[in-house]
Amino acid sequence: MLLVIPAVLDAGKLDRVRKLLDQGKFVDGRLSAGITAQRVKQNEELESGSRQMEQLNNLVMGSLVQHPLYQAGAMPYRVATPYYARYTRGMAYGDHVDDPVMGPPGGGQYRSDVSTTVFLNAPDEYQGGELVIGTSYGEQTLKLPAGDAVIYPSSSLHHINEVTSGQRLV
């Protein structure tokens, strides 16, 4: 299952998202990766626990979970805390699958079967950076408009092509 969800965020929300990301502190994305993914992950993520993270979650996740296509396609019971990632020139994320278990260690963990990527900037703002998802129909390459999202099985082998110029925000 691969489902593109258009217009999760409108222009006004995207503008607020970009301003919050501009104010945020980004850290090495490998800090949130599992042991296997650490070897292939080259990006930066917004530092968790920041004021910007809370505001972004209200904007982005609030819009996503209320979107009727997301409700129908993902049928979410529980939604993990998102990561806000930035890829600049030379950054990529090699082949990986998303962690099947989410939540804090020692309690509150749960299985995750659906992954979501929300595109936060326009595809012409960066070169490369395509999301490539392996499906039973072959590889699907996505570089969606700002504000659009895609959901796909967390068990799908996928990668992010190297960004050759500009900045990719998801």
Protein language model regions, located:
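Catalytic core of non-heme Fe(II) oxygenases with the double-stranded beta-helix
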Residues: 68-169
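Non-heme Fe(II)/2-oxoglutarate
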Residues: 1-83, 170
